[in-house]
Amino acid sequence: MKLLFFDMEFANGKIPGSVFSLGYVVTDEDFNILSGPTDICINPDCEWNSYVADKILAYPMETIESSPLFPACYEEICALFADADIAVGFSVGNDVTALKKACERYKLSPIPYFWFDMERVCKRANKNRGAHGLAGCVTAWCGEAPENQHRSDGDALATMHLMRAICRDAHIDAEMLITAYPECAGDTIAPQNQQKKPKNVHRGGKNGSKRRHHRPRKKTPAQEKATAEGKA
């Protein structure tokens, strides 16, 4: 299983799809890092919220404004999601919506992927229920505050550390955690089913444990191109 931990930052919450960075870390189900942490910087092409510009932005403004627009990053982003079995975030609904809106803004095909929300897991876990926010949950579960807060690659890495800590505490791997919390998962293909248990799970693992078989996902043209290039 390949996991894509991701996080996004937005220039202006009133402008749908105003993404200025997408950070990610790719791991296997035992949390061995395969790629990243990396930030994809994007010119949001909009008026900035003053608070974001002054307090949240982790890069020089010149770096972001000289970065390519979202369409130029689209194929790279599509390839990331196509190559992963699941995308994991914290309070992932905001990121899912922003990525969808960014595609709509530039009239690009939506990116299909299966997601898992660690914030929802933390609210349902038996321990550390008093922790709030990514920093609070990481501190509670990992014993130290995350680094590079509000920088999307830093938050993606912190999300990975959080999931790893919860799995180690329960002596399970990532796939088992995802199977245990189907209500914390969803996909961007059928939004109406995002709160329902994924269909492709059955008991076929060792000792009758649940194992997930991911259903084929319809790929965008950009994803098909990325797959073809990878086989060349």
Residue ranges and their predicted role:
Residues 2-101, 106, 112, 139-144:
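Conserved non-catalytic scaffold segment of RNase H-like nuclease domains
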Residues 52, 99-101, 125-127, 204-213:
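Short, conserved acidic/polar surface loops in the N-terminal third of protein domains
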Residues 74, 131-134:
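Alpha-helix initiation and N-capping motif
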Residues 86-93, 97-103, 133-192:
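Acidic, Mg2+-coordinating catalytic module of metal-dependent nucleases/exonucleases
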Residues 110-114, 170:
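P-loop/Walker A phosphate-binding loop and immediately adjacent motor/lid segment at beta-alpha junctions
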Residues 114-117, 178-179:
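Beta-strand segments within the central parallel beta-sheet cores of soluble alpha/beta enzyme folds
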Residues 116-132:
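Short alpha-helix plus adjacent loop in nuclease-associated cores
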Residues 160-232:
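Acidic two-metal-ion nuclease catalytic site recognized across multiple nuclease folds
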